[in-house]
Amino acid sequence: NETTVYTPANYSVKFTNLTGKATIGFEAVDATGNWLAVDNFRLGLIGEITSDIIISEVQRLVSEGESLQTQMMYKAEAQNLATAIEQAKKITATSTEADVASAVEAINKAIKAAMVAITEYQALQSAIDNAQGQYDVAKNDADKLMEEINKAQELMKNAEATKTGIDNEIIALEKALLAFNLANATPGSGTAPKVTLTNKYVATGATQALVRTTVTGSNILERGVCWSTEHNPTVLDNRTTKSFSLNGTIFHIKGMKPSTVYYIRPYVMNKTYTVAYGDEVKIVTHPAGGCTWSWNEGAPDDAANTRCRNAIKETIDYFNEWTGIKGFHLTGNYGSGTPTADCSYGGWMRIGPNAAYQAIGTVLHETGHGVGVGTHWIWNNCSDTRQNTSSGKWLGRAATEVYQFLENKYTDDYYFQGDKTHGWGRNATYDWLVNGADKDKHSELQYAGGMCIMYGLFLDGL
């Protein structure tokens, strides 16, 4: 059971517990804030479970399970559901508490698994319905689209299918439908789609990249970036529409291979499937990093340990994606007397009890100290890299180039700088290296962008 929660008030949820255990919690759906607060939590007994209640609840679960049996699902889930239904049907008023709990737990588990499988088949059916709705035998390449529709329909009837097989067929059907629409594209009305700017600077990681482009046009259906290991990629190759907005649009490519040459092109497509492409840009992804981590599980409660552990893991994932560093180990330790967090050169880190600092942004920042920011002589005592030897403008080219790319500002007023301990961009929108919990926007772009700047610092000699 669930109760919808909107504003601060008293809320309750009622349930019948036949298994001896229950999980109670909150699910945030389309939340605009970043926290949930629960106060004055009370667990109350409404009444004892009688044999009539047991039989009624079990019969309800049996009916729910049987209603699912008419729908398409994987063979294993169908068999498990049938077994669980038969087990539940054997429950009587004289059944032991253990037998009731076992039967109810089994059928609940089987129902949940069946619903997941049914949803996956329904997604395939929706893709089939969409393709059939746009199919026209009189149009170009209609035979190719129908061939893929037929394959999908056969899979829809196959209980031996797998989730991977269904997911792949949905992708194949969507690609066939796109190819069909492209083969029958018309100019449409209004201003024709056009890529007006392709930024030749691309921030690359091991499997990801950040790309800037500007497009125009009327009735735009989709804009993004496509890529391939071959020249002149199209929207029928790999493509993404995921983007960030910061003084323009930054598209975010994922799913590439490390140490690989790729060709990318921005594109814009209108609602009648006319596509315009920008200039091709060649990129080479980095080798993946080889950083590792550990957490000493020293926090006083599970929640704090989980926050710290996750922040450290995510930080090392960012470092391995964007920096290529190998041989660095981040050793995370709980510091009960540490007001915020700190890290020495080489990766010995302490995280204190303040939950605001048990976060990815803080750990990314402190790990920067672990690899040289503010802790190595190239940073704090080098006239080749610092305008004032230990502070001021960073004199390396790469860090400022990526900073200007992120801000989309290419004048002399935009450069990377810092003091003897920390670094930041001049006139920055974000504090890219997260110099304080209050500077943490909890933004993927801020984190990835900061790592791109970090990589630039390494290229410059740090």
Report each predicted region and the residues it spans.
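Short pre-active-site segment immediately N-terminal to the catalytic Zn-binding motif
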Residues: M349-V363
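Catalytic Zn2+-binding segment of zinc metalloproteases
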Residues: T367-D384
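Metalloprotease/metallohydrolase-associated module, dominated by Zn2+-dependent proteases
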Residues: N380-L462
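Short beta-strand-plus-loop segments that form exposed binding edges in beta-rich domains
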Residues: F26-N34
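Catalytic zinc-binding patch centered on the HExxH motif and its immediate surroundings
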Residues: G327-R350
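Extracellular carbohydrate recognition and processing domains
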Residues: N1-T19, A31, G248
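Beta-rich interaction/scaffold domains
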Residues: I49-L197, N247, Y267-M269, V275
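Short, surface-exposed linear motifs at loops/turns and structural transition points
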Residues: N34, P187-P287
